Amino acid sequence: QYDPLLKGAIRKNLLTERIDIVKPLGWYRDSPTLTDVDVKYLLLYFEENYGLTVEKKIIDAVAVIANENRYHPVCDFLNALQWDGTERIRFCLHRFLGSDTDDYTYEALKLFLLGAISRAFKPGCKFEVMLCLVGGQGAGKSSFFRLLAVNDDWFSDDLKKLDDENVYRKMQGHWIIEMSEMIATANAKSIEEIKSFLSRQKETYKIPYETHPADRKRQCVFGGSSNTLDFLPLDRTGNRRFVPVMVYPERAEVHILADEQASREYINQMWAEAMEIYRSGNFRLRFSPAMNDYLKAHQKDFMPEDTKAGQILDYLERYSGSMVCSKQLYKEALGHDYDEPKQWELREINDIMNNAVTGWMAFSNPRYFPEPYRRQKGWERIRNDNEPDNSMDGFQEIPTEEMEQLGLPEEWLKQK
C-alpha cells in the first residue's frame, strides 16, 4: 500500500472479479490480469526489498490490497463520458445497419443501452430484454455488438449452449454477449430455457481455487442476431424478452467497419447520450404499455405463419352466431371430422382465441350449444355500441342459442 512501485498498481477488477496489475512494474506483461508469473516476480520483489519469504502471507496481502483498491472498468468508462448534445441513439441503427428511425427502433436501442448501463452500475438488476438484429447477412450485426461493447475484452460471442457447465465462466468479465442464431435454431423446449436464462439476475458458482461458491450478480446484457427472418418461435401470447429490429444493409449510411475508429467514436457519444438519460433517472427498464402492444404485433412478422389462427379468423368472419366453443372451432373452423379432440388441440384453440383473436370474450360458466357440442365453456361476440339496433321499442333481438339457454318454450323458438 505504501511501496512506491506497487502503490495503486494492484486492484480488483469488479467486472472480471480478478486481480489486475494496472501499471508497469518492470517486467514484461501482455495482460492486465494477475498471473502466476506475476506472483513469482512479486515474491522475488518482497524478498529482495523487505526480506519477506512467506508466500501465503504475501499472496493474502495482495488479495486484501486489491480488494481495497477495487474498480469497475465499464463504470469508469461511462462516468468519464461527456455528451456533445447531438442525438445518436435514434439514428445509430440506421447509420450502420440501415434500420428504420421510427419510435420503436429508437425505444428498442435506448432500452438495451439503459439495461447495459444499469447492469454495470447495479449488478443483478432486473433486465431480461434481448435486442435482436435480424436479416442482412454480412451487414455487420455481430460487429455492431462488438463495437457497442467498447472494449473487445468486454464482448463475447462464445455462448453457444446454455446447458454447458462452463456457461457461467464464459459470461464472466463480459458486458455485452451476443447469441448468434441461437433462437432461430431453438426448439420449443430450448426457447423456454432461453427465456428462463434471460430472466436470471445472478448465478451461483465457485471460481477455481476459491473455497466456497458465491452469488455472482449479472453485469451483462444479451444481444441476438439472425439472418433468418422468421427466427422467433410461434408464440401467440407474444414475448417481451425478444425485441427484433430489421436491418437493411443497402440503406446503411456507412458500414460499421469502413472506418472502425470513427464508428467507435460515434458509439462512445451514443453511450454518453444514454448516460444523460440514466443520470436523469427518467427511464424504466421496460417498454411502455403502448410500445408493448406494438412489440406483440411486430413480433408476428418474425414468426412462422400461424395457419390455424388464420383458419379460425376466416371462420369467425363468416359466422353469424354470438357464441362459439373450442370443440365447435375444432370441427367447423379447422375442418376435423368430429370426434373427441385431444386436450392439447383444445388448448391450442384456446390459445388462439385468447391471444390472436379480437372481438370475442371468454366466458367461464358453461353454456348450452347445439348438438353435438352440448354444454361447454367458450367465447361470446363483443357487441359494438355502434352497431345498428335492430330491436323494436328498445328491446334487442336474442340469438337462438341464447334463447335455448334460457329454456324458452319451443313455440317461441319456432316463431323466431
Report residues per predicted region.
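N-terminal nucleic-acid engagement/recognition segments and initiation subdomains in replication
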Residues: Q1-F91, D103, E107, D339-E340, ...
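P-loop NTPase catalytic core of nucleic-acid-dependent motor ATPases
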Residues: V62-Q172, I176, L334
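AAA+/SF3 P-loop NTPase mechanochemical coupling elements
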Residues: V167-Q172, I207-S225
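Conserved AAA+/SF3 P-loop NTPase catalytic/coupling segment centered on the Walker-B
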Residues: I176-L198, L232-G238
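Conserved catalytic/switch belt of AAA+ P-loop NTPases
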Residues: I191-A214
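A short helix-turn-beta junction within AAA+ P-loop NTPase domains corresponding to the substrate/partner-engaging
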Residues: L234-A252
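Conserved alpha/beta core segments of nucleic-acid transaction machinery
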Residues: I277-G321
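DNA-recognition alpha helix
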Residues: S326-Y338
